[in-house]
């Protein structure tokens, strides 16, 4: 249970009890983590779901489910948050709101946030440091500026993270014998 309190996680498609409200789902998380019920309303407010707290989870839109998953990860204010595709299913306004929230978390709650996403344009707007993986191999770890410097030194494009990423992956795949 100690690890559960230290790491909050949000997986791409969070699962909830559909016949319970968003609030009731978070109350279960509170009970498991030994947190006071007051943490539920704080978490719902943080992700913008307060007005939908009594709606059954099965009636939530995909974006609302994403927000509820994020609330579940944040509820205990863990020092480490692992978020997998946190903006999946959100409209542009929701993406902006969640991105802004995620960017604020390290300073607001003194935590480390790890985000996994295939939306590289989002990562570019969200991250201070990035890691690039290919077939389980860490190709790069550092700041976006360091990545751009490395890309320039190797003749890779630097217009955006996606182009740089694709060039790094392509070079690694060619080096490994064309594996994709």
Descriptions of predicted regions:
Residues 96-109:
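Helical segment within the ABC ATPase nucleotide-binding domain
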Residues 77:
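Conserved catalytic motifs of ABC-family nucleotide-binding domains
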Residues 70:
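Hydrophobic anchor residue at the start of the ABC signature
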Residues 81-85:
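Catalytic Walker B motif of ABC-type/P-loop ATPase nucleotide-binding domains
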Residues 27, 31, 37-52:
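Conserved ABC ATPase "signature" region
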